[in-house]
């Protein structure tokens, strides 16, 4: 997995995709213009899947492609030392820098978050995006570790946060 910063320009997206040797790109409506700008450079190297309502002509429709897929988990053996994800720095001093994380590191992060927040299966965690950054995602891992509910916040205003906490009965924010 290689989550990308929603603020990246087309050139930064192109740079990160090539550096990570990406085979498949999933993107939503907010990325259409920036992905379209680099299609001539990337379309021969990777599959492009659009996740949204109106799929652009240069991509495949994710929902249509997955409509008849099996719900069975794929039989893929994963070792703790296998590479799991590449996260990128913000790129404030130039192009983003890649940080490679292994499964062991992500599993340990999930365990530590669950311990830190004393998360139980009955908790409800409010996950505040953006998810391209390890900060929000690593906090979310504690609820994944315990099998508790997580709510992905839509918006970032105080009102949206209070509304989500109230309506979803969030116990960890």
Where are the regions that the model predicts?
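Adenylate-forming
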Residues: 16, 25, 27-36, 55, 65-66, 89, 154-159, 168-173, ...
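Conserved S/T- and glycine-rich ATP-binding loop of Class I adenylate-forming
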Residues: 25, 83, 89-92, 125, ...
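Conserved AMP-binding/adenylation subdomain of ANL enzymes
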Residues: 107-124, 132-172
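Conserved pre-ATP/AMP-binding loop-to-beta segment of ANL
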Residues: 67-88, 95, 118-124
